[in-house]
Design a protein with these regions (language model features):
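C-terminal beta-rich recognition modules with glycine/proline-rich loops and embedded aromatic residues
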Residues: 24-29, 308, 372-381, 386-476, ...
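Aromatic (Trp/Tyr) and acidic
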Residues: 24-125, 129, 160-198, 235-253, ...
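Bacterial Sec-dependent N-terminal signal peptides
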Residues: 1-24
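Beta-strand-rich ligand-recognition modules
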Residues: 506-526, 532-546, 679-700, 704-706, ...
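Asp-box/WD-like beta-propeller blade repeats and closely related beta-sheet repeat scaffolds
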Residues: 156-179, 205, 211-229
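Aromatic-lined ligand-binding clefts that engage carbohydrates, nucleic acids, or primary amines
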Residues: 486-492, 711-717
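Extended, charge-enriched "interface" segments that sit outside catalytic cores
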Residues: 142-143
Length: 787
């Protein structure tokens, strides 16, 4: 037992076996908290938090690590900005990271959700006291403000005041000068609703209602054009939370308000089955789709259903990596184009947090093994892999670069969006292991050691499983009395020769149309289901490169560990050379209990040890491998090495890279502009400044070297594109994009005079258009130092 588990057990020893569930509300059977019943028939209901508990497994290890983190967070520090903005004296110093920046307040919402769920599972009075304290503090802030509003970020009164007047200035993450303010409001509202759902705190519900009413007042004077302009800025799950508030209160005004947060630009094409996702910020979109899925449950709106179904299939089958995650630098690319999108910034963790929520809603209406094949894949290989199980810290991105390494959050000085969702991710591993069918059946969706206590049926079901190290799962039933019902067990996609037996008797059945084995009988006390799901090694290719493959064993993605020193980009990441395409011929088992494998003389230039991706931490790795036949490798080796050599040379010289139109890079580079426009073409985003406008940003330089700016443009423009390039207000070049006559990207270099960079670590670059011209479009900026 490692130290983190011992520490966690000391913290939560008196709690017994904890079971935690998710922030998201999935329909429960005969839920008395819900006044508005579902218009859409629900076929699979969620179990209550108190009904499922985890047994020993890697999932429980991760859960305990997260509980440790939640235990050391100080509510007064998360509440600091709320009290300050309400005119009250803060009781703690505000945390760092995004909490000390423009998104202050979002973490409190996630934290409130997490500890509310923790109380629902454990009934620990200390946790309840913490929830109640936060609610009392927020109510005090609401009373002091006298408007119903709750917020913690700077300049918020001006931001909302301008919006209420109908003044809407917006970009992808900016609304009237504020960083995605509706995103933060959503997190607070969701946290309040969770406190009500999971602890019964009625003050939390009242506070959420007051915040929703304030929302209505703020946007009441905006016409549809202004609302749609407002929605260009990320707004989180506002629509979903308002639908849930409608379901709880029965007040239709909240359903109507949810439609005010309907982004026509994105959602209408999706309803028509059009993939308009390339170039879009992934995590901005997914909560919009969750709202559609939830609203369809309540209202039966067919438009919402079309959106949710099409989006899920599009993301899962055309935009996702082997981990089940999606996005590169937070953005989606062209469908089925991922081969050149392996970087340090792949697969934002928030995306998968939200995709699992969406999957849960779709399953409630139409249960299928297909949905949980994805859920399982993403849970093992992205969510579980995004946490350092030793200390509970989380990844913003889970890098898939060949030879990459995970970067984890800091306890008190990060607080990004993915720390917020991570607080919840790792305390909810039991949320969807089981479901209750509308016909009284039991769904077994995931193979995770756990106990289900189904009180209404008088059933306690214990699941013991060897997965993923072994292939046997046992379900043992304890019943207060014999009962006839169906048990539905998912047949996983990764296993073909499955067998299922009851009390040792093999069942001659096949999966039904949903992909589940259905066993209907009169169940008795101590009945036992034995389920064997043979695992094997197999590969999954990149959609646009069949020779670049990831290796799986059962549900688990394997990673090749490459040491604690960054591998050489040319020789440090092996390629696989084999005439045999079957991965079982590539690997030897080193330790089955740890799922440790080793390549058998097929990796060049050296063989590699492979382990579950979720076990990698503080080491470099690769999950994708370039696979060659010996004949192909003989031809390709020189070309392959030369390409990697050139890329390494460029990376070694690179001081800074700036991609336009992306949230964090633009913040990191102090991007400002006037009369600018933004777009996406040729798979990349661009910025352009019109006449009398400008584009300005900071870049890193070497104070003792010759620095060169490399700008990326697209040729064959044939319009007024003449502009000056200034460094610290000194003109270093004049550019005319009409010089570039081919329809392709051009990488154009501009040397920075030594006197402008000497002694400096950064400079300010400005693109200023000539009269009757524009500056740009410019797609990216790279700064290199010359040798």
């Amino acid at each position: 037992m490692n130290k983190i588990i011992i520490k966690c057990l000391l913290i939560v020893a008196f709690l017994g076996v904890a079971d935690i569930k998710a922030q998201n509300y999935f329909p429960q059977f005969n839920d008395s908290r819900i006044k508005v019943k579902n218009s859409t028939p629900i076929k699979a209901y969620a179990f209550d938090l108190s009904q499922v508990s985890l047994l020993e497994s890697t999932f429980k290890t991760a859960m305990l690590a997260d509980e440790c983190y939640l235990a050391v967070i100080d509510p007064d520090r998360l509440l600091s900005g709320f009290r300050k903005n309400a005119g009250l004296e803060p009781k703690g110093k505000i945390y760092g990271g995004w909490e000390g920046d423009g998104l202050a307040g979002h973490s409190l919402g996630h934290y409130l959700s997490a500890i509310s769920m923790q109380y629902a599972s454990t009934k620990d009075p200390a946790v309840l006291a913490k929830v109640n304290y936060i609610i009392d503090e927020l109510v005090a802030c609401q009373k002091a403000r006298k408007s119903g509003y709750l917020g913690a970020f700077g300049n918020e009164d001006k931001i909302w005041g301008e919006l209420a007047k109908g003044n809407v200035k917006t970009g992808g993450f900016d609304l009237n000068g504020g960083w995605s303010p509706w995103y933060t409001v959503h997190k607070i509202m969701a946290g309040l609703l969770d406190a009500y759902f999971y602890t019964g705190n009625k003050k939390a519900l009242s506070a959420s209602i007051d915040l929703a009413d304030w929302t209505q007042n703020i946007i009441s004077k905006l016409n549809d054009e202004l609302l749609q302009k407002m929605l260009f800025c990320e707004y989180g799950g506002m629509a979903e939370t308002l639908v849930n508030l409608y379901a709880i209160t029965g007040e239709k005004k909240y359903l109507d308000l949810s439609y005010k947060f309907y982004d026509k630009r994105i959602l209408d094409p999706l309803a028509k089955q059009q993939d308009i996702l390339p170039g879009k910020h992934s995590n901005t979109q997914i909560p919009k789709i969750i709202a559609s899925a939830r609203r369809h449950e309540i209202t039966g709106d067919q438009n919402d259903q079309a959106i949710a179904d099409f989006f899920w299939k599009t993301i899962v089958y055309h935009h996702s990596y082997a981990t089940g995650g999606n996005s590169n630098y937070e953005y989606l690319s062209e469908p089925n184009k991922l081969n050149d999108k392996l970087t340090e910034n792949t697969t934002e963790t928030c995306n998968t947090y939200n995709m699992l929520k969406l999957t849960g809603h779709l399953f409630a209406e139409n249960p299928s093994a297909e949905l949980f094949d994805y859920y399982e894949k993403a849970l093992y290989n992205h969510i579980l892999a995004s946490q350092n199980h030793d200390d509970g810290m989380m990844c913003y991105f889970v890098p898939l670069r060949m030879g990459g390494k995970k970067e984890y959050s800091d306890q008190f000085n990060t607080f990004t969006c993915c720390v917020g969702t991570g607080m919840e991710n790792h305390v909810k591993y039991n949320e969807s292991i089981y479901s209750r069918g509308d016909d009284g059946s039991l769904y077994v969706n995931l193979f995770i050691p756990s106990v289900l206590n189904w009180k209404e049926r008088g059933l306690t079901l214990t699941q013991q499983t060897a997965l993923p190290q072994g292939d046997q799962t046992t379900l043992t039933l304890k019943l207060t009395k014999a009962s006839t019902f169906s048990i539905r067990v998912r047949k996983p996609k990764w296993s073909t020769e499955t067998t299922i037996a009851v009390n040792g008797e093999l069942q001659k059945i096949t999966p039904d149309q949903t992909g589940y084995y259905v066993i209907t009988r009169k169940w008795k006390n101590d009945d036992k289901i034995s389920y064997v799901t043979p695992e094997k090694l197999y590969t999954e290719a990149m959609p646009d490169n069949t020779d670049r493959r990831a290796v799986f064993f059962g549900p688990v993605l394997l990673a090749g560990v490459l040491g604690t020193t960054e591998p050489d980009p040319i020789k440090g990441v092996p390629v696989f050379v084999s005439a045999n395409k079957d991965p079982k011929e590539w690997l030897n088992v080193v330790d089955q209990s740890e799922l440790k494998f080793h390549t058998k003389n097929i990796a060049q230039p050296q063989d590699v040890t492979m382990i579950p991706f979720y076990q990698t931490k503080n080491q470099f790795y690769s999950v994708y491998w370039d696979v060659f036949t010996p004949e192909k490798w003989a031809v390709q080796q020189k070309i392959y090495d030369e390409q990697k050599r050139k890329q390494k040379e460029l990376e070694d010289k690179t001081l800074d890279v700036f991609r336009f139109g992306e949230m964090q890079p633009e913040r990191d580079h102090n991007f400002t502009a006037a009369k600018e426009s933004m777009g996406e073409e040729h798979g990349s985003k661009w910025r352009m400044a019109g006449e009398e406008g400008f584009i300005q940003f900071d870049v890193k330089v070497d104070p003792n070297a010759q620095n060169t700016i490399i700008a990326s443009y697209w040729g064959m423009d044939n319009r007024g594109r003449n502009f000056d390039i200034l460094v610290d207000n000194v003109n270093i070049a004049t550019e005319d994009l009409n010089r570039y006559k081919e329809s392709r990207f051009y990488e154009i270099s501009y040397k920075i005079p030594l006197e402008l960079s000497k002694g400096k670590t950064k400079v300010t670059v400005k693109l200023s258009p000539k009269a009757k011209n524009s500056a740009g479009p410019v797609y990216s900026i790279r700064v290199i130092k010359e040798k």
